C-alpha cells in the first residue's frame, strides 16, 4: 500500500442516541465505498458481538478504513471510528472523538434531539470537531424534518442549512454525506516529522496474538519492528504486526500521522494498553503524553456468586478472560455466609454490569446469583483515616466512624412538557436536589437534578421510561462525594444476621425499606417447625419485624374426650420440643429470597 498524503485523510466518527440509526448508516457507508462487498454484508456489520446485535447497542468500539473517490476525482481515505452511544461508556466515546477531526451527528427525524445526543455533542465540541448534522429516517411516515431541524438549530446551535437529509436504510443521501465528509471535515495536521505520539482508542484480546491495540497516529510515524512504549503504564514492546482496519485487519509496513490502524506486539494484559494512553517510540520518545488520559474507575459494585459452588473456578476463569477485553472490569474474591464463595465486581454503570453478567451466562455457560448493586461509600473514621467501602458488610460500627459520604451524580432529563411533573416527583422521591429547568423548544424541557448515585443505579431509568411512556431520555455524570445521613440496615433471621442481605440506606428511608424487606422475606422463606422472627435492624435498634408461623402437628388427635391434664401434658411436651428445636435449628434462605430482595431494592 502506498503512503497516503495527510491532506487526503479524513477521520470521523458517528454520534447518535441509541436507536437513531448509527450502525445502519455505518453499514451503508461501508457498502457504498465498496469496503465490504455486498456478499459479506450483514446488518450492523460493525456490531460483531451477538449481544450488541440483540440489544441493538454498540458496546465495543470498532474502526473501518474506507477509500472513496470524490466528485472532484481525488481519492480520499476515510477512517470511521465507531463510538458506543451509551452513557456508561462516556470515557470511550471521548477517546474515540479525540482521535477524529469531525463527526456526523445522526438525529432521528421522528424522535428529535435526545439527552445522549446532547452529551456526545458537548464532548465533540470540547474536542473541536467539525460537526455535520444528518437527519436520518426521513422515509418514515412519522418523520418531521422541519421540527427536528429547528431543534438542531435551537438546542445544539448548528446551522440548519448544513444538515443532510438521509435514510440509511433506503440508501438516500449517502453520497451527500460522503461528499460532506471530504469537503467539510478538515484533514489531520501534517506532523509526520515529529516524534511519535499515537492515541489508543480501543484494545481487545486475541487468543493467538495477545492484545491487539487500535490507535490513531497523532504525530510521527511507526513501522513494523519498532520498539514502542506506552506512556501511562511505562511498558515497552516490539511491534510484530501493524496494519489498517477494513474492518478486517490488513497488515502494512508503516503508518504515519493522521492514519488509524492496529498493532500486535505480544502484549499479555489489556491493563498495559489502556484506552486513552499514548504510544511513543523508545528510540525517539515524545516529551509529553497526549492529554485526557484517565483510568477507568468502577462506579457500581455487586457480588457475583455461582449457584453451584463447584463452578467457582470456572467463574474466576471467565472473569479473567472477560477482563482481558475489558480494562474497566474490576473483581476480587469474597465469601458470604449465605452464598458461599464468589467475587465482588466493579462496573462503569448499570448497563456495563448487565452486559458483563449476560456475557458470563451466555458465553461461559455459568449460572449466577448477583447481589444488589451498590456504590462506593467513603467512610471518615474517628482516627482520621478514610475508608472506601463497597460491601455493606464491611462498614465499620457507628462508634468508629464520624461520617459517611456517598457519590452524587448530575442527572439531565430531556422530556416532553406533559411529563415534567411526574419526573420531578420521581427525582425528588429519590432525594434529588433540583438545580435547573430549561425549555429547549416550546414542547421539550430539560430538568437538571443532583441525585445520590445509589438512588439512580436501581430502577431510576425504568421508572423514568415508564412514567414518560418512553419519551424521556437521561444522561448522568459523577460530580463527587457528599456527606449523607446513611445507616446500614441488617436483616436478622432467628437471631442470626444474614450478611448478604445487608444494605446501606438513608436513615429516613430505612424503616420503610426494612418493612418491605421483612414482608417480602416472610412470603419466601419456607415455614419451619418453630416460629422464625425476621427483623430489620439498624445497629441494635429493630425497625421492622415479621414472624413466620411454625408448622405444628396436631398432638391431640388421639385423645377422645378424656382428661384436660392429659391434653395439657402433650401440648407442654410439644412446646418444649419446639423450644429445643428453635435453639439448635437453623434457617436456610432459599435463592429466590435473595433474588426477590434484589428486585425489591432494584
Swiss-Prot record:
- Gene Ontology CC terms: plasma membrane
Q: Which SUPFAM superfamilies match?
A: EF-G C-terminal domain-like, P-loop containing nucleoside triphosphate hydrolases, Translation proteins
Q: Which UniProt keywords apply?
A: Cell inner membrane, Cell membrane, GTP-binding, Hydrolase, Membrane, Nucleotide-binding, Protein biosynthesis
The keyword Cell inner membrane appears for this protein: yes
Primary place of residence?
membrane
- Annotated Gene Ontology MF terms? GTP binding; GTPase activity; ribosome binding
In what residue span(s) does the tr-type G domain sit? 7-189
Q: Where does GTP bind?
A: 19-24, 136-139
Q: What is its EC number?
A: 3.6.5.n1
- Mention one GO biological process in which this protein takes part, according to its record: positive regulation of translation
EC top class named in words: hydrolase
This chain's function reads: Required for accurate and efficient protein synthesis under certain stress conditions. May act as a fidelity factor of the translation reaction, by catalyzing a one-codon backward translocation of tRNAs on improperly translocated ribosomes. Back-translocation proceeds from a post-translocation (POST) complex to a pre-translocation (PRE) complex, thus giving elongation factor G a second chance to translocate the tRNAs correctly. Binds to ribosomes in a GTP-dependent manner.
Which family is it part of?
Belongs to the TRAFAC class translation factor GTPase superfamily. Classic translation factor GTPase family. LepA subfamily.
Q: What is this protein called?
A: Elongation factor 4
